[in-house]
């Protein structure tokens, strides 16, 4: 659960942040901003997020007007994952975005913080102690034609959901099992696992988006396992009427890129995974050989 601390040095500009709760009119407003602002939101993401992080969805106010939004997810006081702020499209320029990010960071004191930063914010975060870990690329395109189904790919029932911790904690710097399970079983989503010798060796989730259907996460111990899950998820999305799909991949995993390209997806946009080490250094590095699709840009 996200617990924010008292701000340290006030950031520039008079941006004030307040928490937004799931299902509110503010949530709908943020969703309407997100499509053209670089977030990879799926339907239901914000409601699920606020259940696990009640104070983590923040809206930026300037002279009592909503101008920006960001997400802060703190896990066990070990690491916080923040979203790059988005700005109300009625406002222009990057100063509001930077001021919102600065205000959000002021609540996190000396914690370890990770972010998927848009390229134009690289210098902003670098000046605040962040370094670049890798580039993340969004691949998008039409739903590919169905392929032969792999019998090892199965719906994620309760027993399989209880096995997600091993894969998720290998691909994320700390444990977030409860949220990972809820993410997979949220209504309207399809979660599929690859089972080998009664063991979960890969799983993925596809959810409706505000445009393309979005795959994420996608974890697998081998490339052919990732491909089988991807194909099954895409087939189900097409059956539900989706015309396009998107997935955010880590560039250092060439097998993830190859999978997207062989399925007809192309490079759409990109971000930079950046990290600021906290006083409790020693955070676990994700195993990128297992990571074929981020959960989302906002959550890592």
Language-model regions, residue ranges each:
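Conserved acetyl-CoA-binding loop-helix of GNAT-fold acetyltransferases
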Residues: 87, 93-106, 223-236
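Conserved beta-strand in the GNAT
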Residues: 59-74, 80-86, 199-208, 212-214
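Ligand-binding pocket scaffold of soluble enzyme catalytic domains
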Residues: 22, 32-37, 50, 57-58, ...
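A short helix-loop-beta-strand connector motif used in the catalytic cores of GNAT acetyltransferases and
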Residues: 47-68, 81, 135, 183-193
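Conserved N-terminal entry element of GNAT/NAT acetyltransferase domains
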Residues: 1-24, 142-158
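Amide-forming acyltransferase catalytic core, primarily the GNAT-like/NAT-type
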Residues: 28-32, 130-214
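Flexible loop/N-cap segments at domain edges
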Residues: 201-207, 213-249, 262
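Active-site/acyl-donor-binding loops of N-acyltransferases
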Residues: 2-4, 116-117, 128-147, 243-300
């Amino acid at each position: 659960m996200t617990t924010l601390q008292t701000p340290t040095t006030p950031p520039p500009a008079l941006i004030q942040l307040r928490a937004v709760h799931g299902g509110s009119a503010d949530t709908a407003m943020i969703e309407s901003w997100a499509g053209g602002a670089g977030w990879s939101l799926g339907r239901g993401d914000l409601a699920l997020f606020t259940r696990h992080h009640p104070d983590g969805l923040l809206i930026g106010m300037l002279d009592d007007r909503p101008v920006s939004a960001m997400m802060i997810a703190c896990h066990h006081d070990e690491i916080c994952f923040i979203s790059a702020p988005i700005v109300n499209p009625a406002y222009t320029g990057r100063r509001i975005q930077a001021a919102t990010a600065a205000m959000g960071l002021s609540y996190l004191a000396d914690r370890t913080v990770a972010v998927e930063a848009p390229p134009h914010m690289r210098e902003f975060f670098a000046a605040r102690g962040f370094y670049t870990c890798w580039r993340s690329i969004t691949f998008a395109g039409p739903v590919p034609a169905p392929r032969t189904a792999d019998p090892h790919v199965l719906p994620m029932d309760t027993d399989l959901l209880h096995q997600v911790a091993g894969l998720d904690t290998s691909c994320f710097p700390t444990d977030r099992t409860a949220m990972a399970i809820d993410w997979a079983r949220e209504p309207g989503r399809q979660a599929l696992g690859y089972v080998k010798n009664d063991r979960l060796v890969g799983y993925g989730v596809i959810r409706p988006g505000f445009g393309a259907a979005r795959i994420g996460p996608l974890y697998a111990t081998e490339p052919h396992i990732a491909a089988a899950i991807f194909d099954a998820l895409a087939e189900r999305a097409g059956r539900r009427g989706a015309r396009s799909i998107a997935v955010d991949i880590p560039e250092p995993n060439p097998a993830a890129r190859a999978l997207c390209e062989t399925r007809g997806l192309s490079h759409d946009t990109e971000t930079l995974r950046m990290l600021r080490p906290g006083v409790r250094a020693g955070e676990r590095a994700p195993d990128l050989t297992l990571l074929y699709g981020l959960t989302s840009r906002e959550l890592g």
